[in-house]
C-alpha cells in the first residue's frame, strides 16, 4: 500500500495527476516563480576545510552567479554539518565541548569561502535553532505519513562516513598491523557491526518512486546517473534514521522520544529545506533546486534525500551536479603523507581569482583531477597573465590607444585580404556566448573556460596580424583601420570579461573597470555585444576607458609557486 501511495504522491508532486490538472499547473507555476536554490553540501566540521570543499563551493558559485547574470533570480546556500559521532569524538579529543568545537571550525569554512569570494546568500549551521525546528518538523511529517517505525537494526555502521551499510557494501581487509578488519567498499573506512533498537524509515517502499524520478535524468554528469541506476537494481532495505542517545548524545532529539537522536544524514540533508525557509509556508518552503556535491556523498543525495522528500510530499531535487575528487601530485591527499593542499596557502600563492580559475579550468567533474603547483603556475601564466592580460595591455596601451577610448568601427576599413580573418573572428565571438551557456548548463565549466581561452588567443592572433602599431595615425585610411582593430579587440575583451565573471569575478571586474563598462551593462540579459560590427548603434563608441591599475595578473615566478 505504501508503494502505491508513494507513486501517487510522486505523480502529484510533479503535476501528473489527471484529476487535478489545474491545481497541479498552479502549483508548478508557484514553484517555478520561486528563486532557484543552488546549494553546496554542508561541510562536516570534524576537520578543517580542504580543496574538495572549495571545489564544491566554486562550482555552485559559478552556477549561481551565471544565473544572476542571465537575469534569473537565485540563491546560494552553504554551511556546516555539526552533529554526529565524528564531531563528538573530535571535540572530546581536544577537550572541548561540541558546540565550542563546531563554532571554531564552522568559522574556518565561512572564512575560506569569504576569501574565495563565494557569493552565498545563506550559511546554514545544523546547530542553529531554525534548523533544529526544520528537522523536528520534517521528522514529524514523515512520522505522520507512516514512513517511520521502531525496529531493530542489525548491520554494519561506518563512523567515519556516518553511514549504515549492507553486507554487499563491505569487504574484509587486512590493516597495517596484519589484523583482519571489515571496511566500506566505497570509502575504505573501517566498519563495525551494530545491533540496536532504532527508528527506521520505510525506504524499501520508495524504490518505484525513485526509479520514476530518475527518468527525469536529474543526476549529472551521465556516469553518475548510471551509477545510481545500478544501486537501484536491487531492493532497498529500510534505513535506520536514529541512534540511541546512550551511544550518541550530540544530535537533534527525536521529537517524540528523547532517548533517541536523529540520524546525522537525515538531519544534514534537511539543511536545504532550512535554507528555503521550511517549515514556514510564507517563505516559499521549497522551489526549484540544484545540489552540487562530491561523488562520495552521491548515495545520500540520490537515494535517501529524494526518498525523504517524496515521503514528506515535497518535490525531489531538479538536479544533482556531481563532481569527482582531487589528488595531489598523483597521490590521494593524506595528512600522513603531508601532501594535503591547503586552500589558504594557495590563495596566498595564486590570489583568489588565480586559485578559482585553476580549479575550475583544470577540474573536470566526471573524473578525478590532480593538483600540482607546476601545472597551476603554467596554466595561470599562459591563460591569465599572457593571453588575457596581454590582450588587455596591448589594446589599452597609450602608445596604441592614445585617446584612451573605444574608437569607431567600420568593416570597410579592413583590406579585402584580411576580411576573411575579421569574419572568422566575428563569427567566433558571436558564437561564444551560446557555447559558454551550453557548457555551463551541462555542468562543464572547464569546457566553457576552454572556449573563452580559445577566443582570447584568436583575438591575440588577430591583433598581432593586423599590427596596429605599424599604422600611422596621420594617414586617414591607416588611422581608420587602426581604430577598427582596437574597437574590435576592446569589444572582444568586454565579452570575455562578462563571460568570465562567474568564474573569476575579481579579475573580470578589473577588466570591465579598465574598459569603463557601467555596472548595469555587466550582464548577459539585454546586453548587446559587437553592435557596431552589425551597423547598429553602439553605446561604447567614443566612450572613455577607465583608469589603468597595472598588470591584470602578474606572471608567477617559479619560486612563488613551489
UniProtKB/Swiss-Prot annotation:
The gene is mars2. It comes from the Eukaryota. This is Methionine--tRNA ligase, mitochondrial. SUPFAM superfamilies: Anticodon-binding domain of a subclass of class I aminoacyl-tRNA synthetases (SSF47323), Nucleotidylyl transferase (SSF52374). It catalyses: tRNA(Met) + L-methionine + ATP = L-methionyl-tRNA(Met) + AMP + diphosphate. Belongs to the class-I aminoacyl-tRNA synthetase family. It is found in: Mitochondrion matrix. One of its GO terms (molecular function) is ATP binding. It comes from Xenopus laevis (African clawed frog). It holds the Pfam family Anticodon_3.
Amino acid at each position: 500500500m505504501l508503494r502505491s501511495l508513494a507513486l501517487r504522491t510522486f505523480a502529484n508532486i510533479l503535476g501528473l495527476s489527471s484529476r487535478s490538472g489545474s491545481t497541479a499547473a498552479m502549483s508548478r507555476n508557484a514553484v517555478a516563480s520561486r528563486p532557484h536554490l543552488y546549494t553546496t553540501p554542508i561541510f562536516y566540521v570534524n576537520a578543517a576545510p580542504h580543496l574538495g570543499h572549495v571545489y564544491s563551493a566554486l562550482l555552485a558559485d559559478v552556477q549561481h552567479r551565471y544565473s544572476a547574470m542571465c537575469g534569473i533570480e537565485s540563491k546560494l546556500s552553504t554551511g556546516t554539518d555539526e552533529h554526529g559521532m565524528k564531531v563528538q569524538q573530535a571535540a572530546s579529543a581536544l577537550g572541548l565541548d561540541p558546540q565550542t568545537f563546531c563554532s571554531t571550525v564552522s568559522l574556518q569554512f565561512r572564512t575560506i569561502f569569504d576569501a574565495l569570494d563565494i557569493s552565498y546568500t545563506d550559511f546554514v549551521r545544523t546547530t542553529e535553532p531554525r534548523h533544529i525546528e526544520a528537522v523536528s518538523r520534517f521528522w514529524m511529517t514523515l512520522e505522520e505519513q507512516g514512513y517511520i517505525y521502531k525496529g531493530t537494526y542489525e548491520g554494519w555502521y561506518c563512523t567515519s562516513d556516518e553511514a549504515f551499510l549492507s553486507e554487499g557494501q563491505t569487504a574484509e581487509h587486512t590493516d597495517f598491523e596484519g589484523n583482519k578488519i571489515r571496511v566500506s567498499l566505497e570509502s575504505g573506512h573501517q566498519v563495525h557491526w551494530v545491533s540496536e533498537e532504532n527508528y527506521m524509515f520505510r525506504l524499501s517502499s520508495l524504490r518505484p518512486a525513485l526509479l520514476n524520478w530518475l527518468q527525469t535524468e536529474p543526476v549529472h554528469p551521465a556516469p553518475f546517473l548510471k551509477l545510481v541506476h545500478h544501486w537501484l537494481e536491487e531492493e532497498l532495505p529500510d534505513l535506520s534514521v536514529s541512534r540511541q542517545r546512550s551511544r550518541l548524545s550530540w544530535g537533534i532529539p527525536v521529537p517524540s522520544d528523547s532517548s533517541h537522536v536523529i540520524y546525522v544524514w537525515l538531519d544534514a540533508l534537511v539543511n536545504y529545506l532550512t535554507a528555503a525557509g521550511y517549515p514556514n509556508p510564507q517563505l516559499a518552503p521549497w522551489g526549484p533546486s540544484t545540489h552540487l556535491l562530491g561523488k562520495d556523498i552521491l548515495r545520500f543525495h540520490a537515494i535517501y534525500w529524494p526518498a525523504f522528500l517524496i515521503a514528506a510530499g515535497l518535490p525531489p531535487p531538479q538536479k544533482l551536479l556531481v563532481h569527482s575528487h582531487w589528488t595531489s601530485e598523483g597521490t590521494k591527499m593524506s595528512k600522513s603523507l603531508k601532501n594535503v593542499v591547503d586552500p589558504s596557502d594557495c590563495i596566498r600563492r595564486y590570489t583568489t581569482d588565480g586559485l578559482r580559475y585553476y580549479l575550475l579550468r583544470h577540474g573536470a567533474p566526471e573524473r578525478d583531477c590532480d593538483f600540482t603547483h607546476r601545472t597551476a603556475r603554467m596554466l595561470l601564466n599562459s591563460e591569465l597573465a599572457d593571453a588575457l592580460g596581454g590582450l588587455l595591455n596591448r589594446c589599452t596601451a597609450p602608445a596604441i590607444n592614445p585617446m584612451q577610448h573605444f574608437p569607431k568601427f567600420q568593416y570597410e576599413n579592413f583590406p579585402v585580404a584580411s576580411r576573411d580573418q575579421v569574419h572568422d573572428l566575428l563569427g567566433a565571438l558571436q558564437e561564444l556566448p551560446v557555447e559558454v551557456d551550453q557548457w555551463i548548463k551541462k555542468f562543464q565549466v572547464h569546457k566553457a573556460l576552454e572556449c573563452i581561452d580559445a577566443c582570447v588567443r584568436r583575438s591575440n592572433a588577430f591583433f598581432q596580424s593586423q599590427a596596429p602599431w605599424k599604422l600611422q595615425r596621420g594617414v586617414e585610411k591607416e588611422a581608420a583601420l587602426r581604430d577598427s582593430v582596437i574597437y574590435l579587440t576592446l569589444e572582444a575583451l568586454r565579452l570575455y570579461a562578462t563571460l568570465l565573471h562567474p568564474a573569476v569575478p575579481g579579475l573580470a571586474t578589473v577588466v570591465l573597470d579598465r574598459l569603463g563598462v557601467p555596472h548595469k551593462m555587466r550582464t548577459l540579459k539585454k546586453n548587446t555585444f559587437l553592435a557596431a560590427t552589425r551597423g547598429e548603434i553602439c553605446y561604447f563608441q567614443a566612450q572613455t576607458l577607465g583608469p589603468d591599475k597595472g598588470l591584470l595578473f602578474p606572471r608567477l615566478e617559479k619560486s612563488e609557486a613551489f
